């Protein structure tokens, strides 16, 4: 495994992407994981945004906290605040360099820095084609895994009601 995505939810009271226990102690120390940790899209914003986790006061603190907890790459735009976080003394460049080293190592291992790579010649019209989108949808549908079916709750019965709650319930 070269890349792991941390989730939106909390673990032991902390956002998963900012959990030192989850990402550093368990994932990296106990399980000896050496790869990249990337946030789910918008997960770092949830640290400080009103109505979400609200565990950090601002972008700088959230970004520094995520990197210090082992989230190397963010799907979002909070990490743009890392220079301000460095200026405020929330994190130093050496700590950011650890993530940068992991990210660049992965890119070199993938051959992204090689002079000629096969995917350079594939046009966007092919990558973003209907056939590729249809295949991605089929794969997603086939890859959903039910880990437990307690009390045979699935499949849902037509007369059954469920509640969707939380900050992403309307998404």
Which ranges hold each PLM region?
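Glycoside hydrolase catalytic-domain context in secreted enzymes
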Residues: 1-171
């Amino acid at each position: 495994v070269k890349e792991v995505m941390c989730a939106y939810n909390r673990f032991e009271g902390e956002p998963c992407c900012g959990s030192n226990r989850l990402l550093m102690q368990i994932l990296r120390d106990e399980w000896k994981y050496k790869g990249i940790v990337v946030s789910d899209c918008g997960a770092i914003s949830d640290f400080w945004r009103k109505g979400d986790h609200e565990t950090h006061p601002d972008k700088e603190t959230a970004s520094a906290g995520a990197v210090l907890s082992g989230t190397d790459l963010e799907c979002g735009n909070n990490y743009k605040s890392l220079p301000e976080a460095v200026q405020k003394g929330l994190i130093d460049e050496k700590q950011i360099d650890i993530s940068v080293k992991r990210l660049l190592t992965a890119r070199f291992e993938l051959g992204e820095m090689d002079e000629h790579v096969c995917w350079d010649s594939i046009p966007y019209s092919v990558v973003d084609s209907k056939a590729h989108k249809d295949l991605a949808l089929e794969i997603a549908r086939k890859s959903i895994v039910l880990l437990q079916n307690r009390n045979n709750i699935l499949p849902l019965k037509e007369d059954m009601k469920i509640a969707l709650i939380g900050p992403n319930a309307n998404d």
